[in-house]
């Protein structure tokens, strides 16, 4: 009986804390959640204000499905800018939940960056973010060895769990983005992001007797938009990400087809394919109507995990809207498109 109790408790702790340590947001369309990718992407867009939202539902066919949501807003502060650069601020909210214990993470972060205009075509934007995070779980959903009454499992006996149900911590991230831009439809970005700079503790124990620091996450990325013709653009995205022993490579290619290029009725569709190497691939489609952008993709697992998911990874949705003020006649903004 004591051996059974010990084994069940150990199994619970391994599953619980293993998930807690490795859990971080993962969007297949990483390029459509820019403030999660790097604080250096704060304010790097065509317009004055940007609002974005992202949603992902993964692995509905298995008991431990994941739900992820992210929302952000970032702005360019022209009054603190000059012909040499521009100050940008952002606000980010993230939430995800997974598993029978409903392990969740809520994060709200403030971001700041400054876009330095190196010359007419080149821009460098370093950025930083500070966030308040709270992890929660429901110990009442746990089952442990003490619920064995000698004959059978008895759910009426409260589970004995050696941890609290929440943990809060402050988290910092830094990053930088470099943009080379020849025109509205010809530019590329190269950048880096470093999340969990000071490796905050995320243990659920009252008196921690093991390390549960959140490992630093490095992201290195590249994004390209290149006009192939008057009504066709090629878009390429790539990212390498590493967090402790875990790493991944994401690739994406799109054709952007302009259906109407009139400034008042600007309309384009994106058709693309992407992959998370070694795990899944996905088809994607997007619609851009002037300053509104909506995209969707569906992950299809091809790794060994497909035996559990039947290949159905999950749906991912993104939406973005960019606002633009009409500047005074003599005003010349930082020309990041």
Across the structure, where does each feature detected by a protein language model lie?
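Bacterial N-terminal signal peptides that target proteins for export
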Residues: 1-8
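Sec/Tat signal peptide C-region and signal peptidase I cleavage site
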Residues: 17-22
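Subset of outer-membrane beta-barrel
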Residues: 23-337
